Amino acid sequence: MMPSSSFQQTPKPVDLDDPRFEQYDCLPCRLVGAGAFTGLGIYAYSQSRIPLNTPNYKLKRFGILGMAYGFILTGVYRLFQ
């Protein structure tokens, strides 16, 4: 049997609509996130420039280019969010 002094009540849930809990990212967090997405986009772009000797290479190249541009745009969005 547990002693009554060790009994703990669960805390009340936090009201996320409360203005005290508005979440903002700090500048270093935004810079790291933007750098990571932009770097990933640049890497994907550089990999899309490598010639492919496979069937449907144009489709694969455009798919990788689309991902690269998406990552770069996400990085820019993350920076100015």
UniProtKB/Swiss-Prot annotation:
Source domain of life: Eukaryota
Q: Where are the transmembrane segments?
A: none
Keyword Endoplasmic reticulum among record annotations: no
- According to the record, what induces this protein's expression? Differentially expressed during meiosis.
Keywords from UniProt, A to Z, are: Mitochondrion
Q: Which GO terms describe its cellular component?
A: mitochondrion
Has keyword Mitochondrion? yes
From the Swiss-Prot or TrEMBL record, state where the protein is found: Mitochondrion
InterPro entries per UniProt = DMAC1-like_dom, Mitochondrial_unc_protein
Q: What is its main location?
A: mitochondrion
Annotated family: To yeast YDL157C.
PANTHER family given in the database record: ACR195WP
What name appears for this protein in its UniProt entry?
Uncharacterized protein tam6, mitochondrial
Source organism of this protein record: Schizosaccharomyces pombe (strain 972 / ATCC 24843)
